[in-house]
């Protein structure tokens, strides 16, 4: 006990010599004040972090609500039994950034998975007691009893046309939706199966996953229960989280965070491989089977990579179909182009005369991605590559004009960038 008291005295009253303390009588008081201020500030940070965590991370609520409706026979799905009866879905780390969209890493049948579930309807504290009935009424209200399979097919086709555009490939996508709904392969779609698939289609990211299932760089869909779904896990998560503790991130200025990411993140050749994958993903979004898609929040936070440094788009929430963006922007009232913004950075020009937004975006996906890559690839780049890489990235970043009118130049710049990076890492262990 004597040693503990001595240690506390040294911490609280500062390890200065008695002579110095005698010369500066106010120093002891200041040290006590600063020590307790540090304790208070640390306690406050811990409190804020964990109160924020409890609000953002509500996976238990999601599971309770989903399983309640599964047991009532309202919903169905390929992972319902494993989730609610066999308890084979293990919820691990919370990755949610907003309360309404729950994201967890997990384990299912010995596979690393990402678990995603929306709980917007349950977050109102006044309505928590009747959370399950509200989701039954609000989210799982369609199709209604008595709907034929033909009517459900037409209903699905109409929904996809509204969100992806009137494309000749949509009937094939409707076929995929119906095959997915019939998860037990009994050649019929029950009302619970139809309600579950319809609810999933209302989730923007699920619609994108379905549209991009054939693409190499989108996460693969593994199963669902109601509007909860599992995708393959992304072992190394997003770039922004590279070994930075959650409590430390808000305290560090962006410049210092960037420096730490370069120091703690992958070696430059691995970063080049990830960047090539991101550029290939930009190609996949441009005039694919189900139309063109826009990246409307172009940040490294949405990007992930596998254990072998193959790029995977970890979060598709802010990727939007061209038809959806056009519908949002066309005819919208505006004073400046900033009023014509979908998501974070999908911006269209403002017609000052008509005071209405136009439907075409100003900046293509590639220009926004290249702006990210300048900060990610140039630091630590090989000396013999840095100048040419910097020039090409600057050229790419300045791509302008309406996104629908830069196709040829877009493809040429993208091809040059991929070739430059690939030549540097090909025939090495990094390729």
UniProtKB/Swiss-Prot annotation:
Cysteine disulfide links: 57-94, 62-117
Domain of life: Eukaryota
UniProt topological domain (Lumenal) ranges: 52-431
Post-translational modification: Among the many cysteines in the lumenal domain, most are probably involved in disulfide bonds.
Residues in coiled coil: none
Membrane-spanning intervals of the chain: 31-51
UniProt topology in membrane: Single-pass type II membrane protein
Chain ranges on the Cytoplasmic side, renumbered to this chain: 1-30
Motif (May mediate ER retention): 5-6
InterPro entries: FAM69_kinase_dom, FAM69_N
GO annotations of cellular component type: endoplasmic reticulum membrane
Cell compartment(s), UniProt: Endoplasmic reticulum membrane
Record's keyword terms, sorted: Disulfide bond, Endoplasmic reticulum, Membrane, Signal-anchor, Transmembrane, Transmembrane helix
SMART domains: PIP49_N
Family membership noted in the UniProt record: Belongs to the DIPK family.
Protein name as catalogued: Divergent protein kinase domain 1B
Source organism of the structure: Homo sapiens
